[in-house]
């Protein structure tokens, strides 16, 4: 990772490179996967209330399966992701997010995807006693290929072709010095599927 002007108030620039490889042997055959990510991150503090962050990303992702050809892919993902953050007080902020991605598979049926993401997130904190997080995202997918394939699931991150909506709410409260409780609710909706709701309660003990 390479930094310019790190931890300065006006602006900073960081470049990172990550590479991962794995191989697994199963009774039905072996699989190999790899990923390479190059990321450029620019942060500019406009004033005490606003922060601008722009992330440029190139990701190469591949998978090879010995006996399941429909799981083989070599995906290249180019994305640009600007975020504007508004700070209200010391612990509260709102993020306005946009992300544009161009993704293509260079083997097999050579699927392509153009994805746009508009999002907003809200973070509220009260001196370590309680916290609230809410997120809402709108995705527009323009996918060219078989929408029922493994590759479409990977490229669209489990979303559907066309318009998608996702949301998340999380409330955290500190019950004592050793005990926290979290309430989490997740939802998603697309034009071709019914609304999916998922909720959970987590109790965390700190020793």
Language model features by range: what are they?
Residues 1-207:
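Exposed, low-structure sequence patches enriched in small/polar residues
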């Amino acid at each position: 990772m390479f930094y310019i002007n790190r931890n300065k108030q006006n602006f900073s620039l960081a470049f990172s490179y990550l590479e991962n490889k794995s191989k697994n042997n199963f009774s039905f055959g072996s699989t190999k996967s790899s990923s390479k990510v190059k990321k450029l991150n620019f942060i500019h503090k406009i004033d005490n209330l606003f922060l601008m962050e722009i992330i440029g990303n190139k990701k190469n992702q591949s998978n090879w399966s010995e006996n399941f050809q429909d799981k083989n892919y070599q995906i290249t993902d180019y994305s640009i992701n600007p975020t504007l953050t508004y700070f209200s007080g010391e612990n509260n902020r709102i993020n306005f997010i946009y992300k544009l991605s161009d993704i293509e598979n260079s083997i097999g049926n050579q699927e392509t995807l153009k994805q746009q993401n508009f999002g907003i997130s809200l973070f509220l904190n009260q001196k370590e006693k309680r916290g609230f997080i809410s997120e809402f995202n709108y995705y527009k997918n323009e996918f060219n290929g078989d929408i029922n394939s493994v590759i479409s699931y990977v490229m669209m991150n489990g979303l559907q072709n066309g318009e998608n909506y996702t949301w998340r709410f999380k409330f955290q409260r500190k019950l004592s010095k050793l005990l926290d409780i979290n309430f989490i609710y997740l939802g998603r909706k697309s034009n071709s599927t019914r609304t999916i709701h998922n909720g959970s309660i987590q109790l965390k003990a700190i020793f």
